[in-house]
């Protein structure tokens, strides 16, 4: 009987405990659901996924905490990459007189991504933002037809258009290399200003978005006065140049009508190869640099410099490199250091190593650096340091063999173009055999330039012998790649020496620097600092995986470096 009562009590307790655990689980789930509801309260009735609800994109809900109604517009969060923003479209649907100053400024800020719009002066930018309207056209739509009078001019916000000489624009889809205008370009401005007839046809190659300025709005808001001010500025700039001193005002105005002002910020790329550019550029303000992407591996000077410095990778003292003992001195030193044990086999070892190093070439080559000057001993007291063996992959180039890791490139400054100088005419009248065909990059240092197409300029100077004589004097002889490579190596040696000297003279920071948990692995090429460290050429490290790596089509053909850390003597030995 007693056993039965104990068993019944245990079953009852077990049942009650199970009910208690179930109740606790339900309470925890309720609390978790409540937390989720509070966290996602702002996303209730979120209608952004289904396109059917885009007809009513604005919804609202009552916020108990704030005691107010919160309104949410889903159209503000729709991502349409590259398209003109819906808010700006709504502003441009208004008449110019109905647009507020804040709306005009908002449109002006959005249009700063367009290069052609940004080149206008700030007052003219605001006037254009006030009168613009938005248009979107599909593929094969003819925007401007040849022979018609110009009533509008256009800014391309998205898409591509082609320029053709036929009336319907069909040749653009048959030509393998049509003349194209992309986002940021504009066309039709001068035709609107002078009410001239269109000389070409513009057709859409894909769905394209335009910002259009009509002729009526153009003159009603006095945009012609601002455009005339820019034209007067270009005229005065050309008139001050000695090159156009013999031209009449009428002929100079023809040049002004075909020229355009463009502004570039510091470090902005102007042209990847201005020698192949179809434009002539007059620097009206600021300055720019001519750069050359130099393939260092193709230079004999760079190859000799690499091999000279790789011989120092063993880290021997300075005296052992500067002085080489004569055979008699080496024999006397051997007798002193090797007494009573003598091993004559090591006397010719350094010379044999030099001879072995010159025999044969292969893709993978071992660079044997010189060991210590002490001979190889049979006894345990005096031991010579073994020669260090460096194994690296080799490539065969025109000057000779070069370690694969050392085949890099560098951007070298060739020339600085100042205000008043001209680019694009330095080889205009040279024979084809004497022209410099190397690609030269033009980078802005914060400048303003005036562009004009070469064919238009050549038409204006046709049969003008005096002008041609002046242009022949503008020829610029840029240095050869070999000279630029030698200058780069000299500058690099000085920069590395200066850094070594600063590290020696400047006291290190007393406070302990923060060290990350994951130790940084030394690599021969550091893409962040753009430095090639040849001292680590023989050290094997595991490859590091960066968070982001640009596609190869966006990268230059060579690994770009700004400095090369080569094996070198210690700075203390040089100053001793």
Curated annotation (Swiss-Prot):
Keywords: cAMP, cAMP-binding, Cytoplasm, Nucleotide-binding
Protein name (record): Cyclic nucleotide-binding domain-containing protein 2
Primary location group: cytoplasm
Xref: PANTHER family: CYCLIC NUCLEOTIDE-BINDING DOMAIN CONTAINING PROTEIN, CYCLIC NUCLEOTIDE-BINDING DOMAIN-CONTAINING PROTEIN 2
Record-linked CDD domains: CAP_ED
Entry keyword Cytoplasm: yes
GO cellular component: a single term: cytosol
InterPro entries membership: cNMP-bd_CS, cNMP-bd_dom, cNMP-bd_dom_sf, RmlC-like_jellyroll
Coiled-coil residues: none
Functional description taken from the UniProt entry: Essential for male fertility. Plays an important role in spermatogenesis and regulates sperm motility by controlling the development of the flagellar bending of sperm.
GO biological process: spermatogenesis
Localization of this protein: Cytoplasm, Cytosol
GO molecular function list: cAMP binding
SMART domains: cNMP
Binding site for a nucleoside 3',5'-cyclic phosphate: 116-239
């Amino acid at each position: 009987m007693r056993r039965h009562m104990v068993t019944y009590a245990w079953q009852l307790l077990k049942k009650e405990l199970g009910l208690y655990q179930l109740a606790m689980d339900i309470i925890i789930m309720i609390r978790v659901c409540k937390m989720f509801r509070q966290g996602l309260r702002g996303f209730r009735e979120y209608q952004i996924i289904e396109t059917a609800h885009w007809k009513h994109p604005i919804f609202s809900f009552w916020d108990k905490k704030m005691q107010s109604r919160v309104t949410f517009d889903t159209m503000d969060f729709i991502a349409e990459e590259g398209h003109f923003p819906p808010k700006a479209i709504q502003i441009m649907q208004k008449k110019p007189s109905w647009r507020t100053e804040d709306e005009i400024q908002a449109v002006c800020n959005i249009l700063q991504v367009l290069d052609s719009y940004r080149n206008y002066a700030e007052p003219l930018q605001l006037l254009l933002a006030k009168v613009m309207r938005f248009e979107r056209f599909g593929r094969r739509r003819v925007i401007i037809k040849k022979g018609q009078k110009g009533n509008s001019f256009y800014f391309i916000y998205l898409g591509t258009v082609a320029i053709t000489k036929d009336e319907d624009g069909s040749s653009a889809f048959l030509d393998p290399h049509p003349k194209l205008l992309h986002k940021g370009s504009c066309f039709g401005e001068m035709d609107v200003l002078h009410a001239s007839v269109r000389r070409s046809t513009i057709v859409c190659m894909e769905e394209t978005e335009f910002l259009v300025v009509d002729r009526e709005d153009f003159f009603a808001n006095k945009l012609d006065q601002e455009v005339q001010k820019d034209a007067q500025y270009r005229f005065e700039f050309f008139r001050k140049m000695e090159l156009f001193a013999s031209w009449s005002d009428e002929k100079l105005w023809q040049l002004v009508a075909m020229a355009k002002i463009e502004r570039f910020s510091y470090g902005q790329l102007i042209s990847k190869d201005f020698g192949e550019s179809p434009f002539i550029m007059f620097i009206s303000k600021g300055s720019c640099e001519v750069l050359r992407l130099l393939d260092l591996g193709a230079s004999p000077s760079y190859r000799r410099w690499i091999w000279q410095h790789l011989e120092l990778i063993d880290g021997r003292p300075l005296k052992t490199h500067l002085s080489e003992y004569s055979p008699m001195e080496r024999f006397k030193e051997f007798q002193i250091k090797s007494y009573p044990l003598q091993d004559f086999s090591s006397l010719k070892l350094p010379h044999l190593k030099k001879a072995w190093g010159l025999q044969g070439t292969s893709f993978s080559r071992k660079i044997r650096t010189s060991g210590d000057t002490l001979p190889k001993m049979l006894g345990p007291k005096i031991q010579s340091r073994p020669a260090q063996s460096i194994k690296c992959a080799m490539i065969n180039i025109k000057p000779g063999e070069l370690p694969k890791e050392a085949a890099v490139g560098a951007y070298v400054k060739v020339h600085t173009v100042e205000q008043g100088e001209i680019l694009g005419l330095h080889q205009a009248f040279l024979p084809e055999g004497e022209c410099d065909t190397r690609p030269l990059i033009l980078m802005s240092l914060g400048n303003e330039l005036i562009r004009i197409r070469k064919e238009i300029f050549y038409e204006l100077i046709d049969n003008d012998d005096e002008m041609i004589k002046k242009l022949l004097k503008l020829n610029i002889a840029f240095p050869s790649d070999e000279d630029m490579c030698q200058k780069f190596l000299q500058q690099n040696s000085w920069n590395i020496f200066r850094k070594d000297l600063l590290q020696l003279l400047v006291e290190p920071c007393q406070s302990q620097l923060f060290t990350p948990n994951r130790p940084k692995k030394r690599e021969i090429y550091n893409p962040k600092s753009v430095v090639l460290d040849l001292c680590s050429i023989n050290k094997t490290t595991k490859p590091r995986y960066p968070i982001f790596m640009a596609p190869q089509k966006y990268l230059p053909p060579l690994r770009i470096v700004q400095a090369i850390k080569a094996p070198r003597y210690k700075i203390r030995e040089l100053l001793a």
